[in-house]
């Protein structure tokens, strides 16, 4: 999936860039309104690093999905967290934890083989979001 995201214009941040983004996105623990709705390259500039102007989204690979991790919060901007899961059940658990902490008004999306009905049903029953 990482290869496909890169192909589609994602920019994967290194450790230093992730920390700069954390500090820029949530100074003093609150969402920085200046990043809302801005393109990825402008947010990167605000954080003190450069990305190509055609970068569509900034992605931080993180493992902490608690609310202590700024990437786990809603950012209202083209900045995403990417989590690695052991298996499908672990991925659903991570998603549930994020939605539970962030609020049910959000959207959840599952990309899977349409023949995997048990996965689709588990995802739909577990994640209580406004839009599935």
Residue ranges and their predicted role:
Residues 49-132:
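Conserved C-terminal structural/oligomerization subdomain of aldehyde/semialdehyde dehydrogenase
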Residues 1-66, 91-93:
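ALDH superfamily catalytic-core signature
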């Amino acid at each position: 999936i990482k290869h496909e995201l890169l192909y589609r214009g994602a920019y994967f941040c290194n450790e230093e860039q992730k920390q700069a983004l954390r500090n820029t996105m949530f100074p003093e623990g609150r969402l920085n309104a200046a990043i809302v709705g801005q393109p990825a390259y402008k947010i990167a500039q605000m954080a003190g690093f450069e990305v190509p102007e055609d970068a569509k989204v900034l992605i931080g690979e993180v493992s902490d999905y608690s609310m202590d991790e700024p990437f786990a919060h809603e950012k209202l901007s083209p900045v995403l967290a990417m989590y690695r899961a052991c298996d499908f059940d672990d991925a659903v658990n991570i998603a549930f934890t994020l939605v539970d902490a962030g609020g049910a008004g959000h959207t959840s999306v599952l990309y899977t083989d349409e023949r995997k009905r048990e996965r689709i049903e588990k995802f739909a029953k577990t994640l209580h979001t406004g839009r599935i």
